[in-house]
Design a protein with these regions (language model features):
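A short glycine-centered flexible hinge/capping loop motif at secondary-structure junctions
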Residues: 1, 292-296, 315, 319, ...
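Alpha-helical transmembrane segments
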Residues: 2-28, 326-329
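Small-residue-rich transmembrane alpha-helices
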Residues: 9, 230, 309-329
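Short amphipathic beta-strand/extended segments in non-transmembrane regions
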Residues: 28-32, 47-102
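Mid-to-C-terminal secondary-structure elements
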Residues: 90-103, 116-252
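N-terminal membrane-entry
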Residues: 246-264
Length: 329
């Protein structure tokens, strides 16, 4: 039973990725097939301009947010922190996703240039117990000072987006390209769409080809590139997506482990029945005595069922204890 309990915990956790977002069923990542004369690239990014243009052209799109991952060196005073997991993100991040701020305004925290939101873990790392709001950190690569404008709860372990800090997208565009929202050639944005209630993602996808043709068809034809855009449900990214370099699970493994758990339970049930049958001969005398005192079939049946349930509960109790033991002890 301990093995089944551990398998159930594992499968449950693997299947729970990104389910903590209240709008998870309406969030989709935009993914791209980039076809050239020599190869086809299947990527988890789109051009920077795609999401804003979709929001403008289609009323079915309630909102969007884009992120771009980077490992940055962060300096606080004279102390350098290397390869910090950082994201540049649109200010709409906290509207699309349920990343909760404990300090700061979720609407404005990532709106201005040179602003940064830290997780509680990162805030303690850089500032201890001091209030981080208004404090300055330096992006050492470009020597850019960023101001802490918010502190968010640590990202849950069952999130495919994992990082400790989010820097305003306007900080990124300031250094790279102020006209990035109109750039149809730079595939650097991991973009998420929030669709309105009742919107069919398949129906929206059917409109993508003429949408891309109207905005950048000529440019892609001249470059001999075909750009195919599609939507990937947020709840399928971790277990089923083959795109991107984020942490991935495996839905097939979940099915295999679940089948193993069912097989173990079946074997345990068969063993329990065999043991009970073997003991029935030993208990025949007990049954006879109880009958002589007036015990009927229903009472005897209830007794045996209660005994079986009690044994199962005791086994489950010990399985939970065994499963909780730290193997490092």
């Amino acid at each position: 039973m301990s093995a089944c309990y551990l398998i159930a915990l594992y499968v449950s956790f693997e299947s729970s990725y990104d389910t903590f977002h209240s709008k998870a069923g309406r969030i989709f990542r935009m993914v791209t097939d980039i076809k050239t004369p020599s190869e086809t690239l299947k990527v988890d990014v789109s051009t920077w301009s795609t999401a804003p243009a979709l929001k403008k052209d289609f009323p079915e799109v309630e909102g969007f947010t884009r992120i771009n991952a980077a490992n940055l060196n962060i300096r606080k005073g004279s102390i350098l922190f290397k390869d910090e997991k950082t994201f540049f993100a649109d200010s709409s991040l906290f509207h699309v996703f349920d990343f909760k701020l404990v300090k700061g305004n979720p609407v404005t925290a990532l709106k201005e240039q040179l602003s940064i939101v830290l997780t509680e873990k990162a805030a303690r790392k850089y500032f201890g117990e001091s209030d981080p709001i208004g404090q300055i950190l330096i992006l050492s690569r470009d020597n850019l000072p960023v101001t802490v404008t918010g502190v968010m709860k640590d990202i849950p372990a069952n999130s495919h987006i994992k990082g400790d800090m989010f820097i305003s997208m306007s900080t990124f565009t300031q250094k790279l390209n102020n006209n990035l929202d109109a750039d149809w050639s730079d595939f650097g944005a991991v973009s998420y769409l929030l669709l309105k209630e009742g919107t069919s993602p398949k129906a929206l996808e059917a409109k993508f080809a003429p949408f891309l043709e109207s905005h950048a068809g000529k440019m892609f034809r001249e470059a001999k590139v075909q750009y195919i855009l599609s939507l990937e449900p947020l709840l399928e990214i971790y277990l089923r997506s083959t795109r991107g370099d984020q942490e991935k699970g495996n839905a097939t493994n979940n099915y295999i482990f679940s089948a193993i758990a069912v097989f173990i339970i079946l074997i345990a049930c068969i063993n329990f029945i065999n043991l009970s049958t073997a003991r029935s001969a030993e208990r025949a005398k007990e049954v006879g005595i109880r009958k002589s005192f007036g015990a009927g079939r229903n009472l005897l049946t209830a007794q045996f069922i209660c005994e079986s349930i009690l044994v199962s509960l005791i086994a489950f109790f010990f399985s939970v204890i065994l499963s909780s033991i730290d193997p490092g002890i």
